[in-house]
Structure formats: structure tokens, C-alpha cells
């Protein structure tokens, strides 16, 4: 699915931005950051459909109707799913990735139960994740090993590990903690 011009404009409105201010902007990390932050403060992570025993659809037109038209939120699969369509419609290169959460996983190998996006911009590759629903990056992270990235009073970095491949860490309470891992496959 690709969003048409009207749908793109509606998406911008839903996240509190004026499409005309961005329609000629180059497809770079600066634009990604503005879009991601606007999305994070405008569209909530929510699981009301699960609590109400309603089926969740990952069909793009259904996601658009739920999140943009009906002003709802969603889970990571929904929010990042619609974001993938939106970013691709703007012209970004986007790849859907599965990931594993480490929070509350204990010593077990966490299941792949989270969706995030790898986005190709003109100035590099970024990780976009607007569907965590708890302490997490508010802006896309540059996909670069060991690069410490500060945002909104929080500190993150990505490291490569043999078993998990890419691992996202946050610096919290004087230590680096794993948040999630993903591969680029």
C-alpha cells in the first residue's frame, strides 16, 4: 500500500505538523527526527483492542482508518506498520524488522515479539521505533555501533553482539541496560 497525497496530508495533520512546511524537505535524519517526535507525542501506544478481545489487523488501510481517521493509537505492529507505509510513501527506503525485548526477560532468550523499522535516509541509516509504550527513544537512532546518542534526557547506544546481532542499550541508573535486539534480516 502507498498513501496518496490526501492521506499523506492527513497523516501530517494527525501528528500535528503542516504538510506544506515539509513537502520539499530532503529525506534526511532531520526530517525523520521531526516526524518521529511528532508521532510520539501525538499518537499513543495503546492496547484497547486486545483488552476488548477485538482482532487486530495489520492491513494498511485498516491501520490508516484506525490511527489517522479515528484518532486511535495502537501496538508496535500497528504503529510501526503504518509508519512504514507513511515513510515509504514519502520516499524513504524502509525495512521492517523483528526484535526481542530484554526488559523483564530474565535469563531466558526473549521471543521476537516487537516490530521496528530500519530507515534509509540521504544522510545515513536509522532505527525508527514508535511502538514501545514505555521509556524509549523519542527520535530515530542512527544505526552505528558504539555511537552514544542523547535525547530528551536519556542516553542510548547500539552495539553488535555475536548471538543477538544489534542490541539497543540505554544508560539508566548509572549502568548500561539492554532494551532490545534485532537483526537486519
Question: Model regions: which residues?
Answer:
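Short glycine-rich, polar/acidic loop-and-turn segments at beta strand-coil junctions
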Residues: 49, 81, 98-100, 132
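N-terminal start-of-chain detector that recognizes signal peptides
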Residues: 66-67, 87-93, 128-129, 140-141
